[in-house]
Amino acid sequence: MERPPRALLLGAAGLLLLLLPLSSSSSSDACGPCVPASCPALPRLGCPLGETRDACGCCPVCARGEGEPCGGGAAGRGHCAPGMECVKSRKRRKGKAGAAAGGPATLAVCVCKSRYPVCGSNGITYPSGCQLRAASLRAESRGEKAITQVSKGTCEQGPSIVTPPKDIWNVTGAKVFLSCEVIGIPTPVLIWNKVKRDHSGVQRTELLPGDRENLAIQTRGGPEKHEVTGWVLVSPLSKEDAGEYECHASNSQGQASAAAKITVVDALHEIPLKKGEGAQL
């Protein structure tokens, strides 16, 4: 059997070498030897999101944050800060038809892996774990205590009064209402009490509506998340309905209250022209 010419074998071997992947060799050739002394200096005040390595894995560089460009090649995907990943941006991909034909590489941005709110040890809710970590690094740079994640989701907080009830003046037979808006996490439970004081000044409360036929209580969630709005409707108004009414909110983290007075008169001319601030008819 006749052997193939030596020139033909050499040509085939050369062709195989040309077909081999060149990514790893070309990458190492582009990077060259690592010389830490020649690495550019980092910012004087340090990196806000910590450090990572450059595309060659040699020089320290500042890690990139959410929404900042990253990537450009497989070796460059380590530029994002810990807890983030380099994801192609659909918005930036539009109009890049030339990229498939040897044009510029598709750009990408750093995106947080945990895209849900978290509660920090400082009692503040952060939109993501990445933003909590960034806040912790800023706190440490100021010499403050690091912030850690306490739980997933928003931080629990005691109730607070968003809109308190207002004092009311009106005549007997009228229809009046008090309203109160509260917020808290978990969502508070809102109740109404009528405050009574005896001759010695001792206060006691009567849970409403009780057995009053002319009084109704209504409560609904909102207008914002974890908010509750409640109303007391009195119709028809009588002298017995005069007094102090308390809006009381409570949850597992605490309680809050606000009060307003209903003053009942026989005729409109008995209502003083200058009432306390926030009073209404």
Curated annotation (Swiss-Prot):
Post-translational modification: N-glycosylated.
Stretches assigned to the Ig-like C2-type domain: 159-263
Pfam family, one: IGFBP
Residues annotated as domain IGFBP N-terminal: 27-113
Disulfide bridge map: 31-56, 34-58, 39-59, 47-62, 70-86, 80-110, 112-130, 119-155, 180-247
Signal peptide: 1-25
GO molecular function: insulin-like growth factor binding
InterPro entries: Growth_fac_rcpt_cys_sf (IPR009030), Ig-like_dom (IPR007110), Ig-like_dom_sf (IPR036179), Ig-like_fold (IPR013783), Ig_I-set (IPR013098), Ig_sub (IPR003599), Ig_sub2 (IPR003598), IGFBP-like (IPR000867)
Gene3D superfamilies, per database record: 3.30.60.30, 4.10.40.20, Immunoglobulins (2.60.40.10)
GO biological process, one term: cell adhesion
Name under which the protein is recorded: Insulin-like growth factor-binding protein 7
Species per Swiss-Prot/TrEMBL record: Mus musculus (Mouse)
Highest classification ranks of the organism: Eukaryota, Metazoa, Chordata, Craniata, Vertebrata
Gene this chain is encoded by: Igfbp7
